Amino acid sequence: MRAKGISDRHFSRANDRRRGGFVEAEGGGTVILSRGSVAAQMGLPVAGVVGFVSSYADGAHTSIPAPGLGALGAGRGGRSSRLAKALAALGVEADDIALVSKHDTSTGANDPNESELHTRLARALGRSEGNSLVAVSQKTITGHAKGGAAVFQVAGLTEILASGVAPGNASLDVVDAPLAKDAFWVWPRRPIRLAGRGGRDGRVPGAGPVRAGLLTSLGFGHVSGLIAIVHPGAFEAALRQAAGQEAVDAWLASANARLAAGTRRRRAGMIGRAPLFEPVQGRRLGEESRQRDPHEVEAAMLLDPDARLGTDGVYHTGE
């Protein structure tokens, strides 16, 4: 890559005609999934609504990491597919999907395969011709973290839903010819505002929130996965319909308080005024009591369907 005049910073260059493979990365993360009722009761901040998630066999190919079209199965049945019906239940149609957070490994095999997959999927779902679909190539920044890759993408996609801004692929010089011919795609080199505030007047005319985006992970082990994440406004609308505006207001107040507390704690940790990590103290298995072996309590709790957390703060089984 250096011999081609490409700087190290731009080695990962998804969809570019001079791409030459992924940049290795390491990392992981945690995504908290919750039922809507639990989120409302606990006042949990909602970053997005999981509209659809599924994994697929990706076919037998020439090598273990080679990608295929298996995730196209999400669109089996077209407008009557499980994906289309799941999104419709949240008020989302094919034309409302604004972007795809692509696996985009910057390899010769993956990038065109994935673009073809989403082009075919968009047509199967009934997306209108000319309705642009923004490609987000997050690995050009993070590298390829293998097991943590999709977690990174979930974080990035929810940030786009919150901000209305899609990141650009700064490493992209010229879109490879096989990809450039695919319909729908927009390949931004710089961040672009899809919704919300922007422009001289402070607002994109007629633009509402980014309603939904797709995320795909392809390849290794001949397995692929697809996730559809819908704007958190879908949760708010469902809560309003089920419990009224007062419930929405109560949830918002609690969620905003949690977000503020989290921000304060993170910033305090960054300047050394609070620990960023604290080990777990007490697993509620009776560690403090010499009469109970925590290891045995844990094993019994996992096997006993009647095990419950007692008023003393310790798990008890039917022993």
Regions found by a protein language model. Give the residues of each.
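Condensing-enzyme catalytic core mediating Claisen C-C bond formation in acyl metabolism
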Residues: K4-V92, A98-L99, A228-H295
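Short Gly/Pro-enriched turn/cap motifs at secondary-structure boundaries
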Residues: G20-V23, T216-F220
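Short, glycine-/Ser/Thr-/acidic-enriched flexible segments
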Residues: S37-A39, S55, T105-T107, T140-T142, ...
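Short helix-terminating capping/connector loops at secondary-structure junctions
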Residues: Q41-A47, G91-D96, G126-L133, P205-P209
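Short, hydrophobic/aliphatic alpha-helical segments
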Residues: G130-S137, R193-A212
